[in-house]
């Protein structure tokens, strides 16, 4: 991309930093994950968790959610202004699972938010360390992406449920900053904008007055974030139109849905980073690893290395498959929910199966589930190879793709053909090319029609042996293009409900 020079790397977004050189980036990212690790160790001490309990992913998630809730300024302010029965606005908590007499028991804990903020700051050299908080949000978002389908949300905004490969980061809170914006898919941004426009259609005061001015600024900023994800001039020009609209309405919604569809072939660039559960960083810190000194990258070999050497456990329900539970968490750790399964399988070294074939529900356990029958299992999060995470959508190319998901959003920078179902996608583009965006629409459709099979993405990029930390010997895998590559193919994954 031509504008590469003006962009901050993810890591700079991630750590809120200005331009830094590679070593500075590695050490500031190291400082961030080291802080998460120190915080986790301290929380385990507070709750008197055994080593085994501290490695339980469900306990990790509870602790992560508590610190996110403790720092959620807007929600905390809202809770104080609108007291609701039985909710103490100054406290946060969740389920902690403990091993007692050969059984798992659930204990609900409550903690002062102030106390959690103190522990978090203490673990992060007295700073608020918002980058670390965002990192945890992205890990939760990646876990949601791998676990749930967003069919209902897509349909509600007038989009096609088969566009699920564009929905990365759809459950990220708005406060997740630049690092959060970087990992949001095209569909996620489109959905946020459509929701906003719909509110404006239904509420005449939405764009008016002092509040309306702020709303307008937010609208234009979201438009610019989405524009930055597109790689072709016509798509960007169309985003300018949407942004500059005096009174956004149905025409803009149409344009946005058109753009989302076009992204199935003319892919946007969406960042991918491996964000691991807090307990993994905690384990490494506890074993004496100095993240800041050694440096760390979210997009290189480091997360793979960390997972090779970490033992994480998970609660498992009676009829769930332990290997499937591991796959779900592995995909979440590498933000690979929308990656081609053939690529994921090759890197992981074991077959990665579509969501519909997994015998496992989500990682989190609902409060009404029976603990008597719960068991625990070791998650297998190791990999055979590693690959660099990408921030580009790659060029595109035609292959057979599936009924459920008709495109992929690459996670790993690996040379391959990118599957998509041209006939299915193009069928959506009949009709409307009139109106003020007609020339751009025509141009976009022309580009989609001429996307050629030989345009492989990521020329020459490959996977690497885990011993090859400098990425010197790429192995370019060959994929069997005749079988299925989509994760949400013909799927029955649960819906995500807030």
Swiss-Prot record:
Encapsidates the negative strand viral RNA, protecting it from nucleases. The encapsidated genomic RNA is termed the ribonucleoprotein (RNP) and serves as template for transcription and replication. The RNP needs to be localized in the host nucleus to start an infectious cycle, but is too large to diffuse through the nuclear pore complex. NP comprises at least 2 nuclear localization signals that are responsible for the active RNP import into the nucleus through cellular importin alpha/beta pathway. Keywords: Capsid protein, Helical capsid protein, Host nucleus, Host-virus interaction, Ribonucleoprotein, RNA-binding, Viral nucleoprotein, Viral penetration into host nucleus, Virion, Virus entry into host cell. SUPFAM superfamilies: flu NP-like. GO terms for cellular component: helical viral capsid; host cell; host cell nucleus; ribonucleoprotein complex; viral nucleocapsid. It holds the Pfam family Flu_NP. HAMAP family: INFV_NCAP (MF_04070). GO terms for biological process: symbiont entry into host cell; viral penetration into host nucleus. Late in virus-infected cells, may be cleaved from a 56-kDa protein to a 53-kDa protein by a cellular caspase. This cleavage might be a marker for the onset of apoptosis in infected cells or have a specific function in virus host interaction. Homomultimerizes to form the nucleocapsid. May bind host exportin-1/XPO1. Binds to viral genomic RNA. Protein-RNA contacts are mediated by a combination of electrostatic interactions between positively charged residues and the phosphate backbone and planar interactions between aromatic side chains and bases. The keyword ATP-binding does not apply. It is found in: Virion; Host nucleus. The keyword Ribonucleoprotein applies. A motif (Unconventional nuclear localization signal) lies at residues 1-18. InterPro entries: Flu_NP. Belongs to the influenza viruses nucleoprotein family. This is Nucleoprotein. GO terms for molecular function: RNA binding; structural molecule activity. Its main location: virion. A motif (Bipartite nuclear localization signal) lies at residues 198-216. It comes from Influenza A virus (strain A/Grey teal/Australia/2/1979 H4N4). Residues 1-22 are annotated as: Disordered.
């Amino acid at each position: 991309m031509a504008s590469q020079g003006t962009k901050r790397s993810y890591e700079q977004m991630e750590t809120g930093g200005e331009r830094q050189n590679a070593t500075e980036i590695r050490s500031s990212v190291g400082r961030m994950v080291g802080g998460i690790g120190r915080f986790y160790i301290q929380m385990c001490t507070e709750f008197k968790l055994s080593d085994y309990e501290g490695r339980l992913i469900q306990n990790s998630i509870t602790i992560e959610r508590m610190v996110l809730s403790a720092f959620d300024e807007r929600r905390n302010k809202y809770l104080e202004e609108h007291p609701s029965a039985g909710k103490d606005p100054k406290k946060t908590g969740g389920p902690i699972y403990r091993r007692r007499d050969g059984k798992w028991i659930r204990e609900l804990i409550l903690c002062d938010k102030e106390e959690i903020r103190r522990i978090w700051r203490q673990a992060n050299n007295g700073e608020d360390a918002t980058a670390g908080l965002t990192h945890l949000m992205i890990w939760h978002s990646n876990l949601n992406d791998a676990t749930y389908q967003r069919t209902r949300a897509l349909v509600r905004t007038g989009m096609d449920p088969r566009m699920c490969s564009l929905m990365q980061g759809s459950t990220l809170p708005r406060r997740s900053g630049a690092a959060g914006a970087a990992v949001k898919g095209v569909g996620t941004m489109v959905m946020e904008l459509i929701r906003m426009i719909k509110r404006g259609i239904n509420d005449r005061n939405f764009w008016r007055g002092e509040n309306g001015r702020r709303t307008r600024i937010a609208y234009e900023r979201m438009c610019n974030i989405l524009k930055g994800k597109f790689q072709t001039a016509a798509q960007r020009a169309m985003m300018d139109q949407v942004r500059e609209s005096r009174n956004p309405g149905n025409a803009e919604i149409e344009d946005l849905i058109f753009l989302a569809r076009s992204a199935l072939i003319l892919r946007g660039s969406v960042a991918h980073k491996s964000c691991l559960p807090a307990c993994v960083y905690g384990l490494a810190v506890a074993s004496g690893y100095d993240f800041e000194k050694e440096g760390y990258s979210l997009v290189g070999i480091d997360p793979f290395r960390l997972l090779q050497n970490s033992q994480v456990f998970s609660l498992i329900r009676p009829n769930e498959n332990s290997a499937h539970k591991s796959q779900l968490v592995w995909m979440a750790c590498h933000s690979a929910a929308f990656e081609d399964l053939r690529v994921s399988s090759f890197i992981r070294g074991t077959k990665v199966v579509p969501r519909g074939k997994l015998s496992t529900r989500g990682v989190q356990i609902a409060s009404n589930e029976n603990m008597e029958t719960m068991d625990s299992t070791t998650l297998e999060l190791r990999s055979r190879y590693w690959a660099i995470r990408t921030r580009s959508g790659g060029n595109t190319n035609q292959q057979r793709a599936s009924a459920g998901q008709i495109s992929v959003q690459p996670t790993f920078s690996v040379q391959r053909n990118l599957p998509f179902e041209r006939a299915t996608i193009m069928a959506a583009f009949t009709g409307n090319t009139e109106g003020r965006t007609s020339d751009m629409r025509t141009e976009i459709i022309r580009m989609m029609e001429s996307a050629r099979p030989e345009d492989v993405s990521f020329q020459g990029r490959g996977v690497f042996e885990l011993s090859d930390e400098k990425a010197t010997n790429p192995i370019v895998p060959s994929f069997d293009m005749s079988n299925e590559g989509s994760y949400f193919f013909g799927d029955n994954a649960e819906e995500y409900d807030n």
